[in-house]
Amino acid sequence: MDTSPIEGVGTFIYCVTTKRYLFLLRNSSKYSGTWGVVGGKIETNEFTLQSLMREIEEELGGSIENPKIIPIEKFTSDNGNFIYHTFIIPVKREFVPSLNLEHRGYCWVTLE
């Protein structure tokens, strides 16, 4: 029985020009109707940053050119069964993501 913790990644995508963050609206699946950031589970034999780039590609329909990936936090649950790595990626311009089936909308927002 594998007792390794489940690990996930997530990233805030921040537009430095408009000072807004990209959020995605979940589709009619798990957590339907909730807003969140790009992210997901780290697959077996995948490194953290590989997983992050894969999730960006899957959820936004493309990659971010020459991303500057800034680690923010590594959260570990009290029981150690779950680890979540959080990052921020600054971009120069807002863009329109090509959403996959996991999401039905997006918005760029300030945190105020």
Predicted regions and their residues:
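Conserved Nudix-box catalytic region and its N-terminal flanking loop in Nudix hydrolases
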Residues: 19-59
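Active-site-adjacent beta-strand/loop module that shapes the phosphate/pyrophosphate-binding cleft
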Residues: 6, 17, 73-96, 107-111
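Conserved N-terminal beta-strand and adjoining loop/helix that marks the start
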Residues: 1-21
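Short, charged, solvent-exposed linker or helix-capping segments at domain edges/interfaces
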Residues: 96-102
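Residues that flank catalytic or metal-binding motifs in active/ligand-binding sites
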Residues: 7-9, 31, 83-85, 102
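A short coil-to-beta-strand element that immediately follows conserved catalytic motifs
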Residues: 63-73
